[in-house]
């Protein structure tokens, strides 16, 4: 497979919308929503931290330097954008809690502020979050483009959006996925095992994004082309589909089509199951009750079946399934934006947007879908 970045397809068909977005503490805010309530009892102090101009790992290093706590003793649920104003929860052994208030000024000098202190019986681990609330401010937006943006947001609220991995996965030079493949091929290796694992996951992310874009292409052809043209497309791709099956796919109301053999999952979390009754599963998808899952290839990955598998095969790589430490999984192809509110400030030609996304989903994917500029696999705006 060609590892150069290719343009990723959008879900909706509007023309590009021109505006300026700056990923800065003033115009981009991220607030972590924890997975569970903290009990206020236990051996782990839980602090809510606000930071700006710092990555999560840089923040942890500051805590280690100021408090004397080992980085391995600190717990966090996920990485937050360095340029944004972000809040997230960090756990540390209870014995360090008295030092927090004493070092308030030291934290503030490093662009950190402790917002709250709680306690819990376990350390926060990666993935221990429900999702994130976001605020974004778009600048230099004309009234016409504000109107177009609101129309796009109505579609996104109704149907959801592609769950692309964001640019953070691919690095400043767009080559993390290439380094990950080199590690899998034993052509490169770093002493830091976490870095090796991250780079391999970047390669998985690249394959996932590419598969999702291919599925969007197929969905658009099913929706927009005649039955005859659709059958010809599938024939050219060596994909077998009966005319009656294609008719049924065209009748699905959702823009992203559920295919025979898709792996589905109850939304926003639940068990995996196979898409057998496509009409039924498409209706559940419309109701936001279940979502098709894309492949993150690996040793224990669950593969699709039938037509879905035939499409998926192009984005599988045995080197991932043979790698002992790369277990693999499935990831939502599609996510739903919740609690979305927007406001256009005509005097400032600015558009403000607030919304919630489940964990693992990127605000940059929503930005990509709104802006609709031709970009690459790891679009930057």
From Swiss-Prot:
Q: Which GO terms describe its cellular component?
A: cytosol
Residue span, TRUD domain? 160-335
Q: Which InterPro entries match?
A: PsdUridine_synth_cat_dom_sf (IPR020103), PsdUridine_synth_TruD (IPR001656), PsdUridine_synth_TruD_CS (IPR020119), PsdUridine_synth_TruD_insert (IPR011760), TruD_catalytic (IPR042214), TruD_pseudoU_synthase (IPR050170)
Q: Which UniProt keywords apply?
A: Isomerase, tRNA processing
Key word Isomerase present? yes
Q: Which Pfam families match?
A: TruD
Q: Which GO terms describe its biological process?
A: tRNA pseudouridine synthesis
According to its UniProt record, which residues of this chain constitute the active site? 81
The molecular function terms in GO held by this entry are: RNA binding; tRNA pseudouridine(13) synthase activity
Could you tell me what reaction this enzyme catalyses? uridine(13) in tRNA = pseudouridine(13) in tRNA
UniProt EC number: 5.4.99.27
Function, in words? Responsible for synthesis of pseudouridine from uracil-13 in transfer RNAs.
Q: Which family does it belong to?
A: Belongs to the pseudouridine synthase TruD family.
- This protein is called tRNA pseudouridine synthase D
